[in-house]
Amino acid sequence: GGGGRYPGGGGGGRGGGRYSGGGGRGGGGGRGGRGGGGRKCCS
C-alpha cells in the first residue's frame, strides 16, 4: 500500500490506487482517504 493520490475535496491519505471526487477509499493495503462519493480513477 501507499503511493496513491486522492484529489478532490476531502482528499488526501494513502492508498494503492488513485481516487478522484471527495477522496474515496484507498487500496493496495494502504489507508483510505476521507470523504464520501469517491470514484476510482487511473487504478
Swiss-Prot record:
Disordered: annotated span: 1-43
GO terms, biological process: cell wall organization
Induction line: In response to mechanical wounding of plant tissue and probably also after pathogen infection.
Keyword Ribosomal protein: no
Origin: domain of life: Eukaryota
Keyword Cell wall biogenesis/degradation belongs to the record: yes
Keywords: Cell wall, Cell wall biogenesis/degradation, Repeat, Secreted
Cellular compartments per GO CC: extracellular region
Its job: Responsible for plasticity of the cell wall (Potential). Might play a role in wound healing and plant disease resistance.
Record's protein name: Glycine-rich cell wall structural protein
Organism: Solanum lycopersicum (Tomato)
Top-level taxonomy: Eukaryota, Viridiplantae, Streptophyta, Embryophyta, Tracheophyta
